[in-house]
Curated annotation (Swiss-Prot):
NCBIfam families: S20. Disulfide bonds: none annotated. GO terms for biological process: translation. The gene is rpsT. Pfam families: Ribosomal_S20p. Residues 1-27 are annotated as: Disordered. Belongs to the bacterial ribosomal protein bS20 family. This is Small ribosomal subunit protein bS20. Residues 1-11 have a biased composition (Basic residues). GO terms for molecular function: small ribosomal subunit rRNA binding; structural constituent of ribosome.
């Protein structure tokens, strides 16, 4: 553990930030899983609705720097392609 006051403060802030980021990342993954589940079930309308929600969340996480912009684009591209395949 740190001895210097500023180092202790940074350690506390870092841990708080780590927990917040983990929560946000988990939430984002949950939205992505909802789209995959709807696609697997073959429900196009449900998949499209879940995709719109997921898209907002993924874009927000990319803009905040939690994930890279290319990773967000990759998620959206793969899932939209799978939704388009549904008849």
């Amino acid at each position: 553990m740190a001895n210097i006051k500023s180092a202790k403060k940074r350690a506390v802030q870092s841990e708080k930030r780590r927990q917040h980021n983990a929560s946000q990342r988990s939430m984002m993954r949950t939205y992505i899983k909802k789209v995959y589940a709807a696609v697997a079930a073959g429900e196009k309308s449900a998949a499209q609705a879940a995709f719109l929600e997921m898209q907002k969340v993924v874009d927000r996480m990319a803009s905040k720097g939690l994930i890279h912009a290319n990773k967000a684009a990759n998620h959206k591209s793969k899932l939209s392609a799978q939704i388009k395949k549904l008849a």
